[in-house]
């Protein structure tokens, strides 16, 4: 069922955000108060359940409510939803107090303008870079510096957990309980459980690898480096890929070292290079990290000695300044 819904995930996400914004605007101007408050109540009940489920069962490690602008843990997000639920219930009880600020005609125009702005913003962020980048790889970021861990930084405390099948039930044992494992129990797996999270640098899981070798330090020392990023080449925009070789040749003339960055397998890389006649080499990096750098697929990043200078969506390649 989840796989069937995947093609619609982006549309559902964008639509949900637009609905939330419109309901917020409608509440502020007192437009269609009964519909607005009841819709807000239904929405917050759903999200309160969702955030509790995510937090309790540890389905996600951070909340996407405000993205990287205001990072929240799942439990913080659940607490936020509880507060909003209480506030909306207060609005429901006092719904008659809500009065429209303007006439229905003017209120309708305001909501219509808000809808158009939401649609425009949705279109913009899907076809260009965000107007404001709150992520760890925004322009001006020094990647090597962002990866540094201070000497006095707190270390993570990790406990080894051994899972054994005991009489048909998977049972966890710590390394101090190994002597208590019953005879005949079958080993299932070993896991590392984080007891206390240590210092996590702003930039982590970033690497540039090829054929088992790590080229991160070497590449981040390049005075003029162009990275052509596609977290998944199978999902990359064909028109975007078709522009890369011309850009590669133009950048080489200007003295840039040009590399591709992807999490795709070698077979996929070879097929794409052959189809689009790409002559630069692809290096491996974690897919989540590449999506954090830039979700456009492909996207272009310019670095100068490890400092991000320019970032462009494939639709804006002509705006790149070499």
Located regions from the model:
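Interfacial helix-start motif at the membrane-water boundary
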Residues: 2-19, 75-79
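Functionalized membrane-embedded alpha-helices
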Residues: 9-50, 91
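Short loop/turn motifs at secondary-structure junctions and domain boundaries
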Residues: 10, 154, 198, 290-294
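Membrane-interface helix-boundary motifs at transmembrane edges
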Residues: 29-38, 96-107
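Membrane-embedded alpha-helical segments of integral membrane proteins
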Residues: 45-98
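Internal/C-terminal transmembrane anchor helices
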Residues: 102-131
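Membrane-interface segments at or immediately adjacent to transmembrane helices
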Residues: 121-216
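Solvent-exposed soluble domains appended to multi-pass membrane proteins
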Residues: 209, 216-322
């Amino acid at each position: 069922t989840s796989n069937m819904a995947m093609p619609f995930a982006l549309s559902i996400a964008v639509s949900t955000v637009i609905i939330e914004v419109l309901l917020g605007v409608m509440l502020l101007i007192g437009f269609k108060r009964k519909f607005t408050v009841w819709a807000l109540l239904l929405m917050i009940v759903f999200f309160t359940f969702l955030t509790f489920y995510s937090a309790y069962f540890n389905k996600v490690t951070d909340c996407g409510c405000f993205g990287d602008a205001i990072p929240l843990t799942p439990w913080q997000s659940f607490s936020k939803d509880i507060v909003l639920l209480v506030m909306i219930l207060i609005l429901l009880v006092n719904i008659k107090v809500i009065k429209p600020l303007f006439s229905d005609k003017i209120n309708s125009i305001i909501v219509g303008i808000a809808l158009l702005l939401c649609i425009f913003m949705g279109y913009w962020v899907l076809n260009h870079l965000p107007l404001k980048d709150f992520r760890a790889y925004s322009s001006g970021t020094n990647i090597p510096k962002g990866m540094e861990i201070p000497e006095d930084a707190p270390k993570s405390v990790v406990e080894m957990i051994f899972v054994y099948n005991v009489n048909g039930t998977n049972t966890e044992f710590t390394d101090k309980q190994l002597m208590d494992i019953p005879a005949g129990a079958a080993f299932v797996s070993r896991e590392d459980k984080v007891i206390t999270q240590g210092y996590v640098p702003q930039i982590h899981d970033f690497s540039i690898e090829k054929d088992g070798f790590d080229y991160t330090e070497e590449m981040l020392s390049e005075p003029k480096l162009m990275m052509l990023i596609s977290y998944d080449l199978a999902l990359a925009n064909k028109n975007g890929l078709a522009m890369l070789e011309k850009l590669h040749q133009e950048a080489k003339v200007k003295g840039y070292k040009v590399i591709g960055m992807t999490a795709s397998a070698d077979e996929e890389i070879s097929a794409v290079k052959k189809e689009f006649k790409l002559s630069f080499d692809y290096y491996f990096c974690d897919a989540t990290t590449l999506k954090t750098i830039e979700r456009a697929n492909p996207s272009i990043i310019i670095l100068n000695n490890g400092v991000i200078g320019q970032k462009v969506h494939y639709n804006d390649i002509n705006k790149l300044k070499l």
